[in-house]
Amino acid sequence: MEVKELERDKNRVVLEYVFGAEEIAQAEDKAVRYLNQRVEIPGFRKGRIPKNVLKMKLGEEFQEYTLDFLMDLIPDTLKDRKLILSPIVTERELKDVTARVVVEVHEEPEVRIGDISKIEVEKVDEEKVLEKYVERRIEDLRESHALLEPKEGPAEAGDLVRVNMEVYNEEEKKLTSREYEYVISEDEDRPFVKDLVGKKKGDVVEIEREYEGKKYTYKLEVEEVYKRTLPEIGDELAKSVNNEFETLEQLKESLKKEGKEIYDVEMKESMREQLLEKLPEIVEIEISDRTLEILVNEAINRLKREGRYEQIVSSYESEEKFREELKERILDDIKRDRVIEVLAQEKGISVNDEELEKEAEELAPFWGISPDRAKSLVKARQDLREELRWAILKRKVLDLLLQEVKVKVVEPKGEGDDSEGKEDN
């Protein structure tokens, strides 16, 4: 077998495979064995049909089977090439003692990574975030530790109302009966709850609703109305929250530590996402238009199979506009992936089995299974293992790059103009 490069356009390569007489003979023998198990020809026992008879009776069909078996030799020649698309056969022919196959392959495109330090990501001011977090948590604690005192008067803003809700269908059959507690807020507009404003203990509220063409009646009986008194912000509140706290400052420090853990996790993830979004801006890529065209067509065909294409395209000026945007998105995704791959290789970043197991354990609650089951699942499924490996690898590379980018500290939303942020390297 001879392999010749006929054409190269960036990452797209056209290869010609020429097979000799010996390889063709071996492929024909495989075709004979394959066809003898499936073809019956009068006058010959099944499985005993000679090659020359099969070639004569089947003609071009026999040649196609022979070419199929010759093509089984091609994948081994491509194993050292990293491809982003499956090989595409553009020509194949078998004549006498030579066979020729032309294959179009699309390799992973080369990238040139620019100056990472030109990328800017935003980080919300930690001190102000934690200050707001502590204030909000203290208010939550006041709400949860409110003193309740039964009252005879009507329910108003700030009160807690306990009701028994019964639901009846059109035939007046009771479907459910359950107790609920609601805290009435200022300008209350929640369904059902707003109907409790002004009601007293013993009052019954009937509300009719229609769902999917069926009518239901909701009967809410007010069992109790409580006046809520929120505790003052001070040492006594701290003591009521946890007997380990003696002062309000101790409670605030504990809440600040709690908020810091949340802040660190969420801010790191936010900065990773910002960096990932901006990576294409500093990347140049050598990729063929033909590669992008195939990827766009594959994405469109997938949307059509899922029945989502028409709906998505309808939000664009034209199908061409949609194709252009889809092409840009695909190009940016390839840039991101290639940067992660290239830098992981350059920096020696990899993912080991212990990291995969830890990731599986952390994801187990979201999957609704036990940690042991999650680890077993990852071991058993190559696709899932590769998905987790890539997620961890991407995270590691992004964390490394975050050390090089510009960081702009901005005000929390609603706290001021983000443009007045300061840089923090």
UniProtKB/Swiss-Prot annotation:
Q: Which GO terms describe its biological process?
A: cell division; protein folding; protein transport; regulation of DNA-templated transcription elongation
Q: Which SUPFAM superfamilies match?
A: FKBP-like (SSF54534), Triger factor/SurA peptide-binding domain-like (SSF109998), Trigger factor ribosome-binding domain (SSF102735)
* Molecular function terms, GO-annotated: DNA binding; peptidyl-prolyl cis-trans isomerase activity
UniProt function note: Involved in protein export. Acts as a chaperone by maintaining the newly synthesized protein in an open conformation. Functions as a peptidyl-prolyl cis-trans isomerase.
Provide the reaction this enzyme catalyses.
[protein]-peptidylproline (omega=180) = [protein]-peptidylproline (omega=0)
Cell compartments where the protein resides: Cytoplasm
Domain PPIase FKBP-type, by residue range, is: 158-231
Keywords tagged on the record: Cell cycle, Cell division, Chaperone, Cytoplasm, Isomerase, Rotamase
Enzyme category, top tier = isomerase
Keyword Transport in the entry? The reply is: no
Among the entry's GO cellular component annotations, what is one?
cytoplasm
Per the record, the major location class is cytoplasm
Q: HAMAP family, from UniProt?
A: Trigger_factor_Tig
Q: What is this protein called?
A: Trigger factor
Family from the record: Belongs to the FKBP-type PPIase family. Tig subfamily.
Record's Pfam families? Trigger_C, Trigger_N
Comment text on domains: Consists of 3 domains; the N-terminus binds the ribosome, the middle domain has PPIase activity, while the C-terminus has intrinsic chaperone activity on its own.
> Which EC numbers does the record give?
5.2.1.8
